[in-house]
Structures are given as structure tokens and as C-alpha cells.
């Protein structure tokens, strides 16, 4: 069941991973069976009339087909699943998802990575927020505050490091209060471990960006991040000089360099299990 929860800033959507995948398929025009259970679900909520989505849902789905990976990771919580992580940079937001094995991949997991231009993300958020239900209420939340978009546009690394977990915590508080303990715990974990979600740029599962040369500039270290987020448990996992990097075009990436990717995933999972 897709649930929508009102907040002061808008609506937070909650759906299962299956429903999230079905919505992506439907948005991409791959789900054409009018008798499909997910179409029935949408029909039952008044979002499909006959065999066609109502106009505002059509616009929503069209936007989702372009930006759903980012939007779903941020505002559509696959409750209880550690499958999606995201990070943001001066010019883009990126979502990575392990197709098997949970949020943190090992060498056997397939990792999918999507990126969206932050200006497009901003326009999509505000555009979708303006698309009204018949009652005139917005369809998607406006819970991502202006200050975060400002940080993105200005390439302000310090603001990004503060605002990403702040937004996640705000969402976690809403879900923890309004939804259920399991989902609230999921988002609280996302908030507290948000800097781990600032993951490496993925070419394949075990390939990291080349840290040599002038194409990268350090904007923070792991110690800086731990201090900002007060996640002291993670400080012991990495040396203080592990860099967070921005490339010559201002693209923001984080880099973690343990002895091996396998050690990283094992360490993180151990901390999360405590």
C-alpha cells in the first residue's frame, strides 16, 4: 500500500520496494496490463480512471521516468530495506543501489548508479510539488529545503555535509512519529550514517577514482565528516586523511580507502549491527 503522510512542508510517500519498482516500470511505460495488481492499487486510490492515469498522475509518472531513482531514494522510503543510498554534489545528486545483498555491496553484488543534474532535480521537485491533487494539495513533498539547493548550486561542501543529514533526520523524525518504528529506525540509520552514503564514484564494484593528479581537490576529511555528524563510531574505520573530493568540474565525490572494498563493507556492517 502506498501511504502518504502530511508534514508541515508537504507529503512524505512511503511504499514497499515492490511498489517502488512497479511505479518505475509503470512510469517507463513497461507496465501496460490494466489488470496488474499495481494498476489496481492506483485505481483504488483514484489515480487511474479506466485504463489511464488521471492527468496529474500522468505528469507525475512522466517526471518519475526521468528522476525516480533520485526522488524515490530520498522521499519514497522502501520501508525496512537497506537498498538505496544517495549523495549530492555541487552539480548533481547521485543514487547507488545494490541489486542484491542490501545497501552495502561486496565484490559479488551488482551496483546500479544513477545521476541527475541538481538543477533538474530542483525543477522536478518544485514542478511536482505544484502538481495538485483534485483537492489542490501537492503530490510530492517540498521537504528538501531551499538551503540544500543553495548549497548544491554554490558548491558549498560544508553546507552539503551539514544539510544532507539534517534533511534525513527531519524525514526520520516525521516517519518515526507518524509511521512506524521499523521505518523510523531505517531513516534514522540513513541520517546517522549519511556520510557513509556519500560513497565512492562507482565505475564497477571495486573501482575507485584515481586520486592522483590535479583533477581532484580535497574539501574535507573523514575526521571533518565525523565531527559534523557526530558519528564517532565511524572515525575508527578510516584514517583521518581519507579525503572527500571534488573534481575539476566541481563534481562532488567521496572516497574511502580501506585495505580492500571487502574490509570496508564488513566494517560498516559490523558497526551497523551494534
What are these regions (language model features)?
Residues 1-274:
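Short, surface-exposed polybasic-aromatic patches that bind anionic ligands, especially phosphate groups
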Amino acid at each position: 500500500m502506498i501511504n502518504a503522510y502530511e508534514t508541515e512542508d508537504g507529503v512524505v510517500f512511503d511504499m514497499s520496494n515492490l511498489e517502488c519498482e512497479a511505479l518505475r516500470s509503470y512510469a517507463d511505460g513497461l507496465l501496460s496490463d490494466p489488470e496488474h495488481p499495481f494498476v489496481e492499487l492506483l485505481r483504488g486510490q483514484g489515480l487511474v480512471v479506466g485504463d489511464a492515469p488521471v492527468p496529474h498522475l500522468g505528469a507525475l509518472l512522466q517526471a518519475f521516468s526521468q528522476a525516480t531513482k533520485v526522488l524515490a531514494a530520498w522521499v519514497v522510503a522502501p520501508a525496512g530495506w537497506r537498498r538505496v543510498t544517495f549523495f549530492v554534489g555541487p552539480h548533481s545528486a547521485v543514487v547507488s543501489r545494490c541489486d542484491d545483498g542490501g545497501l552495502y555491496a561486496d565484490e559479488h553484488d551488482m551496483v546500479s548508479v544513477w545521476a541527475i543534474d541538481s538543477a533538474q532535480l530542483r525543477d522536478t521537485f518544485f514542478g511536482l510539488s505544484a502538481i495538485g491533487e483534485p483537492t489542490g494539495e501537492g503530490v510530492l513533498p517540498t521537504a528538501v529545503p531551499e538551503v540544500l539547493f543553495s548549497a548544491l548550486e554554490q558548491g558549498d561542501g560544508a553546507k552539503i555535509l551539514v544539510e544532507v543529514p539534517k534533511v534525513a533526520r527531519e524525514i526520520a523524525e516525521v516517519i518515526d512519529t507518524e509511521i512506524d518504528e521499523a521505518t523510523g529506525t531505517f531513516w534514522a540509520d540513513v541520517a546517522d550514517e549519511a556520510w557513509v552514503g556519500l560513497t565512492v564514484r562507482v565505475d564497477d564494484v571495486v573501482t575507485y577514482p584515481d586520486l592522483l593528479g590535479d583533477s581532484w581537490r580535497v574539501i574535507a576529511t573523514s575526521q571533518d565528516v565525523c565531527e559534523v555528524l557526530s558519528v564517532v563510531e565511524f572515525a575508527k574505520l578510516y584514517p583521518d586523511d581519507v579525503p572527500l573530493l571534488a573534481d575539476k568540474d566541481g563534481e562532488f565525490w567521496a572516497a574511502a580507502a580501506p585495505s580492500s572494498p571487502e574490509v570496508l563493507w564488513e566494517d560498516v556492517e559490523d558497526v551497523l549491527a551494534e
